Amino acid sequence: MTSLVMRLANLAKTYPALAEDAKAIELVDQHVQGLPLRPFFEPVSVTLVSKGKRGDVLNGKREVLGVGPEELTSWTRHVALGTRCRMRALEDPIVGHLQAGQTMPAMILLRSHLEAAALAAHCLRELTAAARQGSVETLKELIPKTLFGTALKKHRDKVSVGELLKVFEGDTVQICSAIDSLDRFYYQEQSEGKLCIAYSVLCEFAHPNHRGVKDFMVASERPGGWEITYQLEASADPQLVARGLETLLVSMRAGYAAGELLLSWEFREQDGQLVARGPEVGSTSGGPPDTE
Protein backbone atom coordinates (compact mmCIF):
# COMPACT_ATOMS: atom_id res chain seq x y z
CA MET A 1 0.00 0.00 0.00
CA THR A 2 1.48 3.33 -1.08
CA SER A 3 1.64 6.43 1.08
CA LEU A 4 -1.07 8.07 -1.03
CA VAL A 5 -3.44 5.13 -0.61
CA MET A 6 -2.93 5.14 3.16
CA ARG A 7 -3.58 8.88 3.34
CA LEU A 8 -6.74 8.48 1.26
CA ALA A 9 -7.98 5.71 3.57
CA ASN A 10 -7.35 7.85 6.65
CA LEU A 11 -9.04 10.82 4.99
CA ALA A 12 -12.11 8.71 4.23
CA LYS A 13 -12.25 7.60 7.88
CA THR A 14 -12.20 11.21 9.05
CA TYR A 15 -14.67 12.35 6.39
CA PRO A 16 -16.88 9.35 5.43
CA ALA A 17 -18.72 11.44 2.84
CA LEU A 18 -15.46 11.67 0.86
CA ALA A 19 -14.97 7.90 0.59
CA GLU A 20 -16.23 7.76 -3.01
CA ASP A 21 -13.89 10.49 -4.26
CA ALA A 22 -11.01 8.99 -2.26
CA LYS A 23 -11.57 5.59 -3.89
CA ALA A 24 -11.79 7.19 -7.34
CA ILE A 25 -8.45 8.94 -6.79
CA GLU A 26 -6.92 5.63 -5.68
CA LEU A 27 -8.10 3.96 -8.89
CA VAL A 28 -6.67 6.74 -11.06
CA ASP A 29 -3.39 6.50 -9.16
CA GLN A 30 -3.20 2.74 -9.69
CA HIS A 31 -3.79 3.14 -13.41
CA VAL A 32 -1.20 5.89 -13.84
CA GLN A 33 1.34 3.96 -11.79
CA GLY A 34 1.27 1.23 -14.43
CA LEU A 35 1.81 3.56 -17.39
CA PRO A 36 5.26 3.32 -19.00
CA LEU A 37 7.72 6.19 -19.21
CA ARG A 38 9.19 5.34 -22.58
CA PRO A 39 12.35 7.17 -23.72
CA PHE A 40 12.17 9.26 -26.87
CA PHE A 41 14.54 11.04 -29.22
CA GLU A 42 14.94 14.80 -28.98
CA PRO A 43 16.46 16.39 -32.09
CA VAL A 44 18.58 19.52 -32.18
CA SER A 45 16.24 22.41 -32.95
CA VAL A 46 16.74 26.03 -33.94
CA THR A 47 14.80 28.86 -32.32
CA LEU A 48 14.37 32.13 -34.20
CA VAL A 49 14.46 35.13 -31.86
CA SER A 50 12.97 38.29 -33.36
CA LYS A 51 13.61 41.81 -32.14
CA GLY A 52 10.99 43.33 -29.87
CA LYS A 53 9.30 46.73 -30.09
CA ARG A 54 12.35 48.42 -28.61
CA GLY A 55 14.68 46.86 -31.14
CA ASP A 56 16.18 44.30 -28.76
CA VAL A 57 15.79 40.55 -28.49
CA LEU A 58 14.80 40.54 -24.81
CA ASN A 59 11.11 40.90 -25.53
CA GLY A 60 11.09 39.56 -29.05
CA LYS A 61 9.06 36.66 -30.36
CA ARG A 62 10.56 33.18 -30.26
CA GLU A 63 9.70 30.55 -32.86
CA VAL A 64 10.99 27.06 -33.51
CA LEU A 65 12.18 26.63 -37.08
CA GLY A 66 11.64 23.44 -39.03
CA VAL A 67 8.80 21.85 -37.06
CA GLY A 68 8.73 18.27 -38.31
CA PRO A 69 7.85 14.77 -37.08
CA GLU A 70 10.81 14.50 -34.70
CA GLU A 71 10.23 17.94 -33.17
CA LEU A 72 6.51 17.32 -32.65
CA THR A 73 7.07 13.84 -31.24
CA SER A 74 9.63 15.17 -28.79
CA TRP A 75 7.44 18.11 -27.76
CA THR A 76 4.30 16.06 -27.11
CA ARG A 77 6.34 13.57 -25.05
CA HIS A 78 7.98 16.32 -23.00
CA VAL A 79 4.62 17.87 -22.17
CA ALA A 80 2.79 14.60 -21.48
CA LEU A 81 5.48 12.89 -19.40
CA GLY A 82 6.60 16.07 -17.63
CA THR A 83 2.99 16.74 -16.68
CA ARG A 84 2.58 13.21 -15.36
CA CYS A 85 5.69 13.39 -13.19
CA ARG A 86 4.82 16.82 -11.80
CA MET A 87 1.24 15.85 -10.97
CA ARG A 88 2.19 12.60 -9.26
CA ALA A 89 4.82 14.36 -7.16
CA LEU A 90 2.13 16.72 -5.84
CA GLU A 91 -0.71 14.29 -5.12
CA ASP A 92 0.65 12.61 -1.99
CA PRO A 93 1.42 15.89 -0.17
CA ILE A 94 -1.92 17.40 -1.26
CA VAL A 95 -3.88 14.52 0.26
CA GLY A 96 -1.58 14.49 3.28
CA HIS A 97 -2.29 18.13 4.04
CA LEU A 98 -6.03 17.63 3.50
CA GLN A 99 -5.96 14.67 5.88
CA ALA A 100 -4.20 16.80 8.49
CA GLY A 101 -6.70 19.62 8.05
CA GLN A 102 -3.99 21.92 6.67
CA THR A 103 -6.03 23.46 3.89
CA MET A 104 -3.68 26.32 2.98
CA PRO A 105 -0.68 24.21 1.86
CA ALA A 106 -3.07 21.70 0.28
CA MET A 107 -4.70 24.40 -1.83
CA ILE A 108 -1.38 25.95 -2.84
CA LEU A 109 -0.10 22.58 -4.06
CA LEU A 110 -3.44 21.83 -5.71
CA ARG A 111 -3.13 25.06 -7.67
CA SER A 112 0.19 23.84 -9.08
CA HIS A 113 -1.39 20.46 -9.89
CA LEU A 114 -4.22 22.14 -11.78
CA GLU A 115 -1.73 24.26 -13.74
CA ALA A 116 0.20 21.16 -14.81
CA ALA A 117 -2.98 19.42 -15.95
CA ALA A 118 -4.00 22.58 -17.77
CA LEU A 119 -0.75 22.70 -19.73
CA ALA A 120 -1.36 19.22 -21.12
CA ALA A 121 -4.95 20.07 -22.06
CA HIS A 122 -3.90 23.36 -23.66
CA CYS A 123 -1.20 21.74 -25.78
CA LEU A 124 -3.64 19.03 -26.86
CA ARG A 125 -6.19 21.66 -27.84
CA GLU A 126 -3.69 23.70 -29.85
CA LEU A 127 -2.21 20.63 -31.53
CA THR A 128 -5.66 19.41 -32.53
CA ALA A 129 -6.57 22.83 -33.93
CA ALA A 130 -3.31 23.02 -35.87
CA ALA A 131 -3.87 19.57 -37.36
CA ARG A 132 -7.39 20.44 -38.44
CA GLN A 133 -6.08 23.60 -40.09
CA GLY A 134 -3.26 21.67 -41.74
CA SER A 135 -0.66 24.14 -40.44
CA VAL A 136 1.97 24.16 -37.69
CA GLU A 137 2.38 27.95 -37.63
CA THR A 138 0.73 28.41 -34.22
CA LEU A 139 2.86 25.61 -32.76
CA LYS A 140 6.09 27.36 -33.73
CA GLU A 141 5.47 29.86 -30.91
CA LEU A 142 3.75 27.49 -28.51
CA ILE A 143 6.55 24.93 -28.42
CA PRO A 144 9.25 27.28 -27.05
CA LYS A 145 6.74 28.74 -24.58
CA THR A 146 6.01 25.31 -23.13
CA LEU A 147 9.60 24.04 -23.17
CA PHE A 148 11.68 27.18 -22.64
CA GLY A 149 9.25 29.67 -21.11
CA THR A 150 10.44 31.13 -17.82
CA ALA A 151 9.19 33.60 -15.21
CA LEU A 152 12.76 34.92 -15.01
CA LYS A 153 12.37 36.50 -18.43
CA LYS A 154 11.02 39.76 -16.99
CA HIS A 155 14.28 40.18 -15.03
CA ARG A 156 16.53 39.41 -18.00
CA ASP A 157 18.05 42.91 -18.01
CA LYS A 158 19.55 42.28 -14.55
CA VAL A 159 23.09 40.93 -14.76
CA SER A 160 22.57 38.32 -12.04
CA VAL A 161 19.59 36.87 -13.90
CA GLY A 162 20.80 37.41 -17.44
CA GLU A 163 23.73 35.11 -16.81
CA LEU A 164 21.32 32.28 -15.95
CA LEU A 165 19.19 32.54 -19.07
CA LYS A 166 19.70 31.45 -22.64
CA VAL A 167 18.65 33.74 -25.46
CA PHE A 168 15.93 31.31 -26.60
CA GLU A 169 14.19 31.36 -23.20
CA GLY A 170 11.19 33.67 -23.23
CA ASP A 171 7.51 33.97 -22.37
CA THR A 172 5.41 31.20 -20.86
CA VAL A 173 1.88 30.26 -21.86
CA GLN A 174 -0.97 32.32 -20.42
CA ILE A 175 -2.14 30.15 -17.55
CA CYS A 176 -5.73 31.44 -17.68
CA SER A 177 -5.97 30.28 -21.29
CA ALA A 178 -4.58 26.90 -20.26
CA ILE A 179 -7.12 26.56 -17.43
CA ASP A 180 -9.88 27.39 -19.90
CA SER A 181 -8.56 24.63 -22.17
CA LEU A 182 -8.68 22.20 -19.24
CA ASP A 183 -12.26 23.19 -18.45
CA ARG A 184 -13.33 22.72 -22.07
CA PHE A 185 -11.50 19.40 -22.30
CA TYR A 186 -13.05 17.94 -19.15
CA TYR A 187 -16.58 19.27 -19.35
CA GLN A 188 -16.86 19.36 -23.15
CA GLU A 189 -20.27 20.82 -24.16
CA GLN A 190 -21.12 21.48 -20.49
CA SER A 191 -18.06 23.69 -20.05
CA GLU A 192 -18.98 26.89 -18.25
CA GLY A 193 -15.76 27.87 -16.51
CA LYS A 194 -16.04 25.76 -13.34
CA LEU A 195 -12.31 25.06 -13.27
CA CYS A 196 -11.53 28.70 -13.96
CA ILE A 197 -13.49 29.62 -10.82
CA ALA A 198 -11.82 26.83 -8.85
CA TYR A 199 -8.42 28.09 -9.96
CA SER A 200 -9.26 31.62 -8.81
CA VAL A 201 -10.23 30.26 -5.39
CA LEU A 202 -6.92 28.37 -5.16
CA CYS A 203 -5.08 31.59 -6.00
CA GLU A 204 -6.59 33.13 -2.86
CA PHE A 205 -4.43 30.74 -0.85
CA ALA A 206 -1.29 31.03 -2.97
CA HIS A 207 -1.40 34.84 -2.98
CA PRO A 208 -1.36 36.99 0.19
CA ASN A 209 -5.11 37.63 -0.07
CA HIS A 210 -6.98 37.80 3.22
CA ARG A 211 -9.51 35.14 2.22
CA GLY A 212 -6.73 32.56 2.33
CA VAL A 213 -6.01 33.01 6.07
CA LYS A 214 -9.57 33.03 7.42
CA ASP A 215 -9.10 29.59 8.97
CA PHE A 216 -6.28 30.96 11.11
CA MET A 217 -8.45 33.46 12.96
CA VAL A 218 -11.33 33.38 15.43
CA ALA A 219 -13.77 36.29 15.65
CA SER A 220 -15.76 36.98 18.82
CA GLU A 221 -18.52 39.58 18.81
CA ARG A 222 -17.99 42.66 20.90
CA PRO A 223 -20.04 45.85 21.20
CA GLY A 224 -19.43 47.78 18.01
CA GLY A 225 -17.28 45.09 16.37
CA TRP A 226 -15.32 41.90 16.93
CA GLU A 227 -12.31 40.67 18.85
CA ILE A 228 -9.99 38.89 16.43
CA THR A 229 -7.58 36.23 17.60
CA TYR A 230 -5.07 34.65 15.22
CA GLN A 231 -3.70 31.17 15.85
CA LEU A 232 -0.77 29.39 14.24
CA GLU A 233 -2.79 26.25 13.54
CA ALA A 234 -5.69 26.59 11.12
CA SER A 235 -9.05 25.08 11.99
CA ALA A 236 -10.10 22.43 9.49
CA ASP A 237 -12.96 23.35 7.17
CA PRO A 238 -14.72 20.09 6.13
CA GLN A 239 -16.41 21.77 3.18
CA LEU A 240 -13.10 23.11 1.89
CA VAL A 241 -11.48 19.69 2.34
CA ALA A 242 -14.29 18.15 0.29
CA ARG A 243 -13.96 20.70 -2.50
CA GLY A 244 -10.20 20.29 -2.52
CA LEU A 245 -10.43 16.52 -2.91
CA GLU A 246 -13.07 16.85 -5.63
CA THR A 247 -10.91 19.33 -7.55
CA LEU A 248 -7.89 17.03 -7.22
CA LEU A 249 -9.89 14.16 -8.72
CA VAL A 250 -10.98 16.30 -11.67
CA SER A 251 -7.44 17.58 -12.19
CA MET A 252 -6.04 14.04 -12.15
CA ARG A 253 -8.63 12.67 -14.55
CA ALA A 254 -8.33 15.56 -16.98
CA GLY A 255 -4.56 16.02 -16.79
CA TYR A 256 -3.64 12.37 -17.20
CA ALA A 257 -6.20 11.87 -19.97
CA ALA A 258 -4.88 14.89 -21.88
CA GLY A 259 -1.34 13.61 -21.46
CA GLU A 260 -2.22 10.16 -22.77
CA LEU A 261 -3.99 11.67 -25.77
CA LEU A 262 -0.88 13.72 -26.52
CA LEU A 263 1.17 10.52 -26.44
CA SER A 264 -1.22 8.89 -28.90
CA TRP A 265 -0.34 11.37 -31.67
CA GLU A 266 1.87 10.11 -34.48
CA PHE A 267 3.84 12.25 -36.91
CA ARG A 268 5.64 11.35 -40.12
CA GLU A 269 6.76 12.87 -43.39
CA GLN A 270 5.18 11.71 -46.62
CA ASP A 271 5.93 13.09 -50.08
CA GLY A 272 7.66 16.08 -48.51
CA GLN A 273 4.69 16.94 -46.30
CA LEU A 274 4.12 16.60 -42.58
CA VAL A 275 1.44 14.04 -41.76
CA ALA A 276 -0.12 14.14 -38.29
CA ARG A 277 -2.45 11.49 -36.98
CA GLY A 278 -4.30 11.87 -33.70
CA PRO A 279 -7.62 11.13 -31.97
CA GLU A 280 -10.72 12.64 -33.62
CA VAL A 281 -8.62 14.25 -36.35
CA GLY A 282 -7.54 11.28 -38.41
CA SER A 283 -4.59 11.88 -40.71
CA THR A 284 -3.83 15.43 -41.86
CA SER A 285 -1.15 16.83 -44.11
CA GLY A 286 -0.75 20.39 -45.31
CA GLY A 287 -4.46 20.96 -45.95
CA PRO A 288 -7.95 20.13 -44.67
CA PRO A 289 -7.87 16.97 -42.55
CA ASP A 290 -9.16 13.69 -43.91
CA THR A 291 -9.60 10.44 -42.04
CA GLU A 292 -7.69 7.34 -42.98
Language model feature labels by segment:
Residues M1-E115, L119-R125, A129-E292:
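A cross-kingdom marker of C-terminal helix-rich interaction/assembly modules
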